[in-house]
Design a protein with these regions (language model features):
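Condensing-enzyme catalytic core mediating Claisen C-C bond formation in acyl metabolism
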Residues: 1-25, 167, 277-342, 347, ...
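Conserved active-site "lid/cap" helical segment
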Residues: 1-62, 66-74, 81, 161-173, ...
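N-terminal extracellular/periplasmic Venus flytrap/periplasmic-binding protein-like
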Residues: 12, 24, 32, 175-230, ...
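Conserved catalytic cysteine-centered active-site region
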Residues: 25, 56-110, 139, 152-158, ...
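Active-site-proximal alpha-helical scaffold in enzymes
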Residues: 85-117, 160, 166-195, 308-315, ...
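Flexible glycine-/small-residue-enriched beta->alpha junction loops
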Residues: 110-164
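Active-site pocket-lining segment
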Residues: 160-164, 196-201, 209, 237, ...
Length: 445
């Protein structure tokens, strides 16, 4: 079969800072909130979601089958299958692409996909403790750096790699700071105009209940949660079996949502956006690497958040009365020497254009993940596209980069940008650790 895949709904959480508003929320609960929001916005009955694919990079200590956890917490049925994918920063985008492939080949009609990350929740590892210490000190390993931000092959940070490419292409510190300033200003303007309401799902974060969201009216998916996983069998067949009380899940693990009169705060905007950013303040910051050009200002922060989309077979969507937001047309992936990771979004986008016989002028919207300002400036330079035409609402430098979620976030952003501008083709592209790049082609109208 060769079905077409359409997107029926998208949602993402606001992104939190390291140790910030979402730091007590497990990644799987963030994923559940995004899933529930996307499903609610799509109008699809939660019971019709056949499969869930979620990207997550920092899985140490999260627990078995993270996507399955998020699926259950979002209220989806035990018959809804799931899988977790890890392609570093491209994880969420790969989840969306994998869902489209399953739909295109006829394996599934409706799949929810996206990504989630709690970088605040990444643990420290004591690797030698398994076999015991004879004597002496032990070494703690930061799982966030080791599993997410460190090139295993060349033993260098992602920031060092971005700075290397910027230096070789002649991209200056001043250009990178100017781009970062633009990202913040665009993000501030997008929220002020109300444009982000279609994209961001506000959260009522319980201020005194660790790891919970307050819902005044539970999202549709949460309301559809299997009503009673305790209390014995509902039938004589094994297939009708409901676990007995002693095997019932912990309610706190089952749903991230709570109701009632609970103290909470409304979290509705990305926490890292700076209205007061200035080029003068940025210029005072020291680079991350000696003699480098990447700083805390022209790189994204360490963030928490999730994003999700509901994808479906076009014919199924039409026959069930659903309106498609966009069509997922194609995907391209490339690999290169990992120190040159900043080249890969341009390489993937170029490959995607060639595959589909499209030119640069055919693309109405570009969303390039701001792994660093240098990555977007590199992409613009290699493709020959004005960087001012990319990331029109700002990007990860301002909004944040929860690494497992960003790939899904930029696909959703491209869709909403295209709809705002009357349709056309859009490309979302992202680099990922190990020297890989991915790009997705979407169409509205």
């Amino acid at each position: 079969m060769n079905s077409k895949t359409v997107v029926l709904g998208t949602a993402r959480t606001p992104f939190g800072r390291l140790g910030g508003a979402l730091s007590a929320i497990p990644a799987t609960s963030l994923g559940a909130a995004a899933l529930a929001g996307a499903i609610d916005r799509s109008g699809v009955d939660p019971a019709e979601i056949e499969h869930v694919i979620l990207g997550q990079v920092l899985q140490a200590g999260v627990g078995q089958a993270p996507a399955r956890q998020a699926s259950f917490k979002a209220g989806l049925a035990k018959t809804t299958t799931s899988e977790t994918v890890n392609k570093v920063c491209a994880s969420g985008l790969l989840a969306v692409v994998s869902a489209a492939r399953m739909i295109n080949d006829g394996s599934n009609a409706v799949v929810a996909a996206g990504g989630m990350e709690s970088m605040s929740g990444a643990p420290y590892l004591l690797k030698e403790a398994r076999t015991g210490y004879r004597f002496g000190d032990g070494k703690l390993v930061d799982a966030m750096i080791a599993d997410g931000l460190w090139d295993y092959y060349f033993e260098m940070t992602m920031a060092s790699q971005g700075a290397k490419v910027a230096r070789e292409l002649g991209i200056t510190r001043e250009e990178q700071d100017a781009y970062a300033y633009q990202s913040h200003q665009r993000a501030v303007a997008a929220y002020a105009s109300g444009e982000m309401k279609e994209e961001v799902l506000p959260l009522h974060v319980a201020s005194k209940l660790k790891g919970k969201f307050v819902v005044e009216k539970a999202p549709q998916a949460a309301r559809a949660r299997i009503p009673a996983l305790a209390g014995g069998s509902s039938g004589s067949s094994m297939w009708d079996h409901t676990p007995a009380e002693e095997f019932a899940p912990n309610p706190d693990a089952w749903s991230p949502f709570v109701t009632g009169d609970v103290p909470h705060v409304l979290f509705e905007r990305d926490e890292a956006i700076r209205e007061d950013s200035s080029l003068e303040a940025m210029a005072k910051l020291k680079p991350i690497d000696k003699d480098g050009t990447i700083t805390a200002a022209n790189a994204p922060g360490v963030n928490d958040g999730a994003a999700a989309l509901v994808l479906a077979d076009e014919a199924w969507a039409r026959s069930n009365g659903h309106t498609a937001l966009a069509t997922i047309l194609d995907h391209a992936t490339v690999g290169w020497d990992s120190p040159y990771i900043a080249l890969t979004p341009a390489m993937a986008a170029h490959k995607l254009l060639e595959k589909n016989n499209l030119s640069l002028s055919d693309i109405s919207v570009w969303e390039i993940n701001e792994a660093f300002s240098a990555v977007v400036l590199t992409t613009a330079k290699l493709l020959g596209v004005d960087s001012a035409k990319m990331n029109l609402n700002g990007g990860a430098v301002a909004m944040g980069h929860p690494i497992g979620a960003s790939g899904a976030r930029i696909v959703g952003t491209v869709i909403h940008q295209l709809r705002k501008r009357g349709g056309g083709y859009g490309i979302a592209a992202i680099c990922s650790g190990g020297g890989q790049g991915d790009a997705v082609l979407v169409k509205v109208g």
